[in-house]
Amino acid sequence: MTPITRPVMIIGDSSRAMLALTETMVDSDFDVVASVMDGESLVLAAQHYQPALALLDFTPSFGDALAASRQLSQNHPTTKVVFFSTHDDATYAAAAFEAGAAGFLVKQRTSDLTSLLTRILRGERIQHPATLPTPSRQ
């Protein structure tokens, strides 16, 4: 029996980074169906591939990634959007979730990416702990 794979699309600013993410998923049940360099291309490709998950490395343009997340959330509500960032900042995480993201992962702190993505596809909202706001003191 052939294992079921889940289609994933990646947006990133460099071929090298996208290749590294693709290689991370080789021995998993994720199948990278497309890698693109900007949000507009991601939205267009999503119409064709209907991905289960879109992984956004937003380093070059946070605004572009937010716009893509909003469009994917509206046009493809079953696609889970995950931001994959070098920015360990609650402001970025909050903006990502407001734009429809299901996850916000910090690259330097993500040791088991495929496990986290699987949890997100099961409906969990995952946000790197360091990006959580500090509780206010009463």
Predicted region positions:
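Acidic, metal-coordinating helix/loop segments flanking the phosphotransfer/catalytic sites
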Residues: 35-53
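Short, conserved "switch-loop" micro-motifs in signal-transduction and mechanochemical regulators
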Residues: 87-88
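Conserved phosphotransfer cores of two-component systems
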Residues: 47-49, 72-78, 99
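Short, flexible helix-to-coil linker/hinge segments that flank and couple to helix-turn-helix
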Residues: 94-97, 108-138
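Two-component/phosphorelay signaling modules centered on CheY-like receiver
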Residues: 15-34
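Conserved phosphotransfer microenvironments
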Residues: 55-70
